[in-house]
Amino acid sequence: MSTTKVKRRVGKYELGRTIGEGTFAKVKFARDTETGDPVAIKILDKEKVLKHKMVEQIKREISTMKLIKHPNVVRIYEVMGSKTNIYIVLEYVTGGELFDTIVNHGRMREDEARRYFQQLINAVDYCHSRGVYHRDLKPENLLLDSYGNLKVSDFGLSALSQQIKDDGLLHTTCGTPNYVAPEVLEDQGYDGAMADLWSCGVILFVLLAGYLPFEDSNLMTLYKKISNAEFTFPPWTSFPAKRLLTRILDPNPMTRITIPEILEDEWFKKGYKRPEFDEKYDTTLDDVDAVFNDSEEHHVTEKKEEPEALNAFELISMSAGLNLGNLFDSEQEFKRETRFTSKCPPKEIVRKIEEAAKPLGFDVQKKNYKICSPCLTTICMNIPFKLRLEKVKAGRKGNLNVATEILQVAPSLHMVEVRKAKGDTLEFHKFYKNLSRTLKDVVWKSDDLQNQLS
């Protein structure tokens, strides 16, 4: 049995759950109600954009990215604006992060790492040729599509964390130093293209080695290692790969290898295939200007989020590949999120999550919501409990942030979703494993659920 579902809508898009969060933006899964196609929508706080005086740069870079249709770059479909938000409609990429593969399986074979690196360089080179620089290449920005092809996200959208000063060069303070070029850390101004290339080199090293070239618990020592390019190759690295990486991870941007030179490198060229794509398609940039127009006639229609009722069958069908026992399956590949069901009351589930989180140095913030008309046949999507877990001590990629939601399936049955909101994937992996041990006695196995539903 099911009831009417009312979801939050923005224009023609029906918004779903949050799939990512950052300082300036939140990313939600959405569906085009006209075509049924899935998309991702990045939601920016307009006030923050205006406060940082980045309007013109954001408009310019989004305009450029709208014109780019490259097989290895996440595409921007359209941009919408309301009085308070900017909505960037993006291609939805289903394969997860490239670095999830490293977490699950360790380092890659050289030919596999080379293929991904070739696709990364293709994407970076193409965008650089159009004056767009990433400036924040890191694992979260490297996604895989359903065919296993690399997709680079957030090209042209990193300007929110940058500042251009009077010298005309980019300046930034970076909370993710492991992938960042020495000249960026020095904050003396830097060339966006050369900084991107350094990050590509760090990424290639991780693919080949299975670990970071620059790592230290002491931030100043880490900065010194990066500035002097102090790293050691693992013994299995081939000489041609070493030679290329040494030229990319050159701390002097003036002598660092360039992308045209990489394209001629013998190691890089092995098995290289140029990307095939067609740029000849109609597009419009009218929506980019309209986003920052204060006139309400240019604002997209927003509908407030309201409680939604789903039956248990719908809940499972909307959760692609849902395995309610996967939290405790040792063979299950690690992902950025997981779900399970429990017959325990929400407060007991919350207590167990706190038991797992606090010893690991997490601050736990609770939000309670009143349950809306619960009944035996429906799930109330008005979340009864929502937790935000934040690591007090910043890791190598800032503070790990974990979002947890507990939803009622029936008065005696709840579904719990745990996902990484922001921070380092490896850190979340450690938290995930500890959580699985702590919660074993509160999880209701998937076989039990299937018997209940049959």
UniProtKB/Swiss-Prot annotation:
Its cofactor is Mn(2+). One of its GO terms (molecular function) is protein serine/threonine kinase activity. Residues 305-329 form the NAF domain. CIPK serine-threonine protein kinases interact with CBL proteins. Binding of a CBL protein to the regulatory NAF domain of CIPK protein lead to the activation of the kinase in a calcium-dependent manner. Signal peptide: none annotated. The active site is at 136 (proton acceptor). CDD domains: CIPK_C, STKc_SnRK3. Residues 335-364 are annotated as: PPI. It catalyses: L-seryl-[protein] + ATP = O-phospho-L-seryl-[protein] + ADP + H(+); L-threonyl-[protein] + ATP = O-phospho-L-threonyl-[protein] + ADP + H(+). PANTHER family: CALCIUM/CALMODULIN-DEPENDENT PROTEIN KINASE KINASE-RELATED, CBL-INTERACTING SERINE_THREONINE-PROTEIN KINASE 3. The gene is CIPK33. Its EC number is 2.7.11.1. One of its GO terms (biological process) is signal transduction. It comes from Oryza sativa subsp. japonica (Rice). The activation loop within the kinase domain is the target of phosphorylation/activation by upstream protein kinases. The PPI motif mediates the interaction with the ABI (abscisic acid-insensitive) phosphatases. Residues 154-183 are annotated as: Activation loop. InterPro entries: Kinase-like_dom_sf, NAF/FISL_domain, NAF_dom, Prot_kinase_dom, Protein_kinase_ATP_BS, Ser/Thr_kinase_AS. ATP binds at residues 19-27, 42. This is CBL-interacting protein kinase 33. Keywords: ATP-binding, Kinase, Manganese, Nucleotide-binding, Serine/threonine-protein kinase, Transferase.
